[in-house]
């Protein structure tokens, strides 16, 4: 019995020493493209855990050319998110949008992909105009870079914070169903109680509506 216990303890110590030698994080081993679509590509990412086990993680990306670790996590932002209020910071722009991936209406911030050659601020102005008809006439801040769905994708966003004005117009694309609106803090608090939000929009609106 003592001999078995000693062997068990020895094995545990050796395993712990091995983990220390490897470091405290998983080791990237490689990435394999599994399926390429028009807008997203699915990959299997292989890691080795600290105890030497293989971990295959399924993920999707906007990029169709991820071949190494640097391309997995070192890329430029894919999209912009626009956080726009009126001049007095009393109302915020939210889109009520039908999201096809979930088959439901969701409240979120205006957002969209950054076109090749565009700066994030340019993309923000274009996307806000296309989705709502409003003009982003002032940019106060640019927050980057964040992951939009870190559980299964390396898609990244830059948040553009600024002021908007103008009249609402229908989206310029029939592939999107969007109803934009101005909302006061009291109205946002009521929306949060009753309706579904994109996670980042929900978190920001909760804090903003209570300032």
Provide a role label for each language-model segment.
Residues 1-25:
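N-terminal amphipathic/basic-hydrophobic helices that include classical n-h-c signal peptides
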Residues 78-81, 112-200:
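Unchanged
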Residues 50-51, 86-89, 98, 163-167, ...:
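Short loop segments at secondary-structure junctions
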Residues 76-83, 88-126:
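Conserved Nudix-box catalytic region and its N-terminal flanking loop in Nudix hydrolases
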Residues 24-36:
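Short amphipathic beta-strand and strand-loop transition segments with alternating hydrophobic
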């Amino acid at each position: 019995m003592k001999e078995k216990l000693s062997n068990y303890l020895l094995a545990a110590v050796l395993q712990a020493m091995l983990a220390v030698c490897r470091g405290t994080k998983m080791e990237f081993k490689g990435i394999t493209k599994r399926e390429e679509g028009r807008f997203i590509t699915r990959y299997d990412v292989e890691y080795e855990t600290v105890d030497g086990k293989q971990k295959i993680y399924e993920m999707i990306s906007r990029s169709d050319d991820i071949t190494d670790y640097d391309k997995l996590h070192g890329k430029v932002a894919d999209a912009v998110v626009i956080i726009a209020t009126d001049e007095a910071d009393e109302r915020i722009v939210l889109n009520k949008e039908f999201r096809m991936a979930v088959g439901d209406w969701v409240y979120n911030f205006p957002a969209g992909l950054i076109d090749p050659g565009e700066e994030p601020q340019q993309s923000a102005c274009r996307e806000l105009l296309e989705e709502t008809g409003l003009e982003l006439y002032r940019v106060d801040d640019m927050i980057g870079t964040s992951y939009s769905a870190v559980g299964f994708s390396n898609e990244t966003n830059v948040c553009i914070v600024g002021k908007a004005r103008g009249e609402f117009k229908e989206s310029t694309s029939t592939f999107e169903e969007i109803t934009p609106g101005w909302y006061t803090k009291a109205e946002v608090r009521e929306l949060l109680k009753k309706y579904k939000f994109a996670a980042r929009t929900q978190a920001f609106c909760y804090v903003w509506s209570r300032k």
